Amino acid sequence: SEQNWKKVRTADGVIGYVKNKTLKNEEKKNITRKFEEQDYSNISKDYTINMAWHNVTNQDANNAVAQRIAQTKGLTTLAPTWIHVADTNGNISSIASADYVSYAHKQNVEVWMTVRDFDGGISSEQESYELLSYTSRRETLITQLIAEALRVGVDGINVDFEKISDKCGEHYIEFIRELSVKCRQNGLVLSVDNYVPKSFNTQYDRKEQGIVADYVVIMGYDEYYAGSPEAGPVSSYNYVKEGITETLKEVPAEKVISGIPFFTRLWKETPKTEEELKSDKGTDAEQYSTTVESDAYGMDNAQAIVKQAGVDTTWDKKAGQNYATWEADGSKYEIWMEDSKSIEAKLKLMKKYKLAGTAEWSLGQESSDIWNLIQKYVN
């Protein structure tokens, strides 16, 4: 019976049972835990961050770095989209280039390589969960990320994971903690990209990110996104403001970077046919009387489209953007512009809330006048 046995543990952690009558020399001891609080000391730059994501899709695109930097002013940091998570075991695929980094360094620009859980390699919530819910897989991923960072000589790692489900939240933040420790040991800056805070993305745990990461970046765009059932601005003034004020409830201002778009969307709305209306009955789509398509355009292309349509823009005070609409081929077109006026309003928010800096998606989509403006606010 149980009374005849005692549960014991050896000094090296093996647990089992022994018979009471075999136990001799009993004594009581207080065991102290040798637990050391993890050090999450942070790297903080002594200048306003002006980071541009560089959407690099293949090895050859790295050669454009000289041309891209030459167009900018006041740029402090480049975040090339070099790294994809190749599989759920934590292997990475990389198009990182040491030449790119050394060129950027000669121009006094830091490089924080971006790693993503979409757009090549894994690209679903289930796969991100499969990856992050295993300690061993997180370890593989972190080891490969650090090795690649050291191989090409980057200054930091930028994490852009956008496929984190509710159940994955605890594993994701553990990954950020573990990566943070390794970045610290190797002198690498860790920045983490985040959605504008909403009730449905609390699993990203911005509060904990604000402790363990060096910088927390808000992606202040995709308010209305590709596949959105209705047309609207990509990045209205209030959306950016809400992103900042909500993030500041959990993260100190000196760690917050406000991400803004260099792109916009042209929306095409077409009335649904009788057949489409019928097939949408009883679904979420029923509330919309039009089908909506959109394409993303950089600033200059957006201006050209409006000019070609022969219409004028009007200032949409609520959105804080210039707006245009017109009809053609039985469809209605709408566009909320990103231009110097809308960008300046967003940069003023960065200043007002004394944030660490700004970030832009993405390099090459801006009009040439934008950099003079940005330089005014980051210096």
Model-derived features: positions:
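Catalytic domains of carbohydrate-active enzymes, especially glycoside hydrolases
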Residues: 61-86, 144-157, 346-357
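Conserved, mostly hydrophobic/aromatic
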Residues: 78, 159, 179, 216, ...
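Conserved beta-strand/loop element in small beta-rich adapter and peptidoglycan-binding domains
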Residues: 1-3
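Substrate-binding cleft and catalytic face of glycoside hydrolase catalytic domains
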Residues: 76-83, 98-136, 143-156, 178-189
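Glycan-binding loop/region signatures in secreted carbohydrate-active enzymes
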Residues: 31-36, 120-122, 127, 264-346, ...
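Acidic/aromatic/glycine-rich contiguous surface patches that form carbohydrate-binding/processing clefts
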Residues: 342-379
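Substrate-binding surface in catalytic domains of secreted glycosidases
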Residues: 88-95, 143, 166-302
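Boundary regions of SH3-family modules and the immediately adjacent low-complexity/disordered segments
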Residues: 9-43, 48
